[in-house]
Amino acid sequence: MHIDVYFYLVKSAHQKTGGIAMVEATSCGGVVIFRGKILLLYKNYKNKYEGWVLPKGTVEEGEEYKETAIREVMEESGTTASIIKYIGKSQYSFSTPQNTVLKDVHWYLMMSDSYYSKPQREEFFMDSGYYKFHEAYHMLKFANEKQILERAYNEYIDLKKSNLWGNKKYF
């Protein structure tokens, strides 16, 4: 969950319910893998929110979901990654003083070309790194991201078994 400025950049459908605006937001992110390890980011938002997360962010106007996922991975982690395949969608909601935000996140299995990462401090990311599946799974703060990680990692294993991982002509 990013407590950034989603409601300023998102396509929103404002429905007044009891004085609170309901805002629908769409983000995209990636489960980025290099040599079997998964990229995670550690976010500490003004000491109110902290934990390990997958890279994701808000879709900008005119942007395709794949473009958003690639851009957000680069912005939040400094990592260059390519899309392998669509994994699925997760949903959650959170509240701000002005709104209840209903968030859809579209996830992609992605491949990096190195272990390099540099967390985006301006967005309160304090650390980043690549971790083995079982480590990453237990480090992740949110259950919905754990489910996406599990789905993406199973796809990765299937591609590895078929000798298709890393062979870009198949994607």
PLM segments and residue spans:
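Short, Lys/Arg-enriched N-terminal segments with co-localized hydrophobic residues
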Residues: 3-21
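A generic structural signal for ordered secondary structure
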Residues: 29, 37-39, 66, 86, ...
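Functional cleft and adjacent loop/helix regions within the main domain
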Residues: 55, 61, 170
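Unchanged
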Residues: 59-147
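Charged phosphate-binding loop/patch that engages nucleotide di/tri-phosphates or the phosphate backbone
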Residues: 143-171
